[in-house]
Curated annotation (Swiss-Prot):
Its EC number is 5.3.3.2. It comes from Shigella sonnei (strain Ss046). Homodimer. Mg(2+) binds at residues 67, 87. The lineage of its organism: Bacteria, Pseudomonadati, Pseudomonadota, Gammaproteobacteria, Enterobacterales. InterPro entries: Idi_bact (IPR056375), IsopentenylPP_isomerase_typ1 (IPR011876), NUDIX_hydrolase-like_dom_sf (IPR015797), NUDIX_hydrolase_dom (IPR000086). GO terms for cellular component: cytoplasm. Catalyzes the 1,3-allylic rearrangement of the homoallylic substrate isopentenyl (IPP) to its highly electrophilic allylic isomer, dimethylallyl diphosphate (DMAPP). Pathway: Isoprenoid biosynthesis; dimethylallyl diphosphate biosynthesis; dimethylallyl diphosphate from isopentenyl diphosphate: step 1/1. Residues 30-164 form the Nudix hydrolase domain. This is Isopentenyl-diphosphate Delta-isomerase. GO terms for molecular function: isopentenyl-diphosphate delta-isomerase activity; metal ion binding. Belongs to the IPP isomerase type 1 family.
């Protein structure tokens, strides 16, 4: 895969430039554009993934299915499809917006900061998974209600962005409706 960049944003969310992805994520990460996706199978189960130990931020942490950064000239939806293919080797239905104005800042225990405008999407898988071990060390298909209960009971076991997304009542409602619509 070619070198990825992040699209830097000002406080109003307007693009101001780009920076190489790994150089962008530091203890003083600038606001940038990202996306987050929750993938479901035909049974309505959510794919929860565990980040590879080689990841710069939150290694080994359980999270929602796939996250990433759109590239210049790429729509968020196309970026979701690209990263699903790269990380999971999977084809998906067109991504649907779940939480378009999600924005967060969180600091990893090693000091790396995420500072993102991060629209959230849901999609269904349409092929078998072919996991990229450089990205994902483990995965599990789970009932959404069980995952949400786990997040509520043990938020420290999940990525902060997943916890914050699940805490939004409208996003939770839309994810539940998406999971039930087979």
């Amino acid at each position: 895969m070619q070198t990825e960049h992040v699209i830097l944003l000002n406080a109003q969310g307007v693009p101001t430039g780009t920076l190489e992805k790994y150089a962008a994520h530091t203890a003083d990460t600038r606001l940038h554009l990202a996306f987050s996706s929750w993938l479901f199978n035909a049974k309505g189960q959510l794919l929860v993934t565990r980040r590879a130990l080689s990841k710069k931020a939150w290694p080994g942490v359980w999270t929602n299915s796939v996250c990433g950064h759109p590239q210049l000239g790429e729509s968020n939806e196309d970026a979701v499809i690209r990263r699903c293919r790269y990380e999971l080797g999977v084809e998906i239905t067109p991504p649907e917006s779940i939480y378009p104005d999600f924005r967060y800042r969180a600091t990893d225990p090693n000091g790396i900061v995420e500072n993102e405008v991060c629209p959230v999407f849901a999609a269904r898988t349409t092929s078998a998974l072919q996991i990229n071990d450089d990205e994902v060390m483990d995965y599990q298909w789970c009932d959404l209600a069980d995952v949400l209960h786990g997040i509520d009971a043990t938020p420290w076991a999940f990525s902060p962005w997943m916890v914050m997304q699940a805490a939004n009542s409208e996003a939770r409602k839309l994810l539940s409706a998406f999971a039930q619509h087979n």
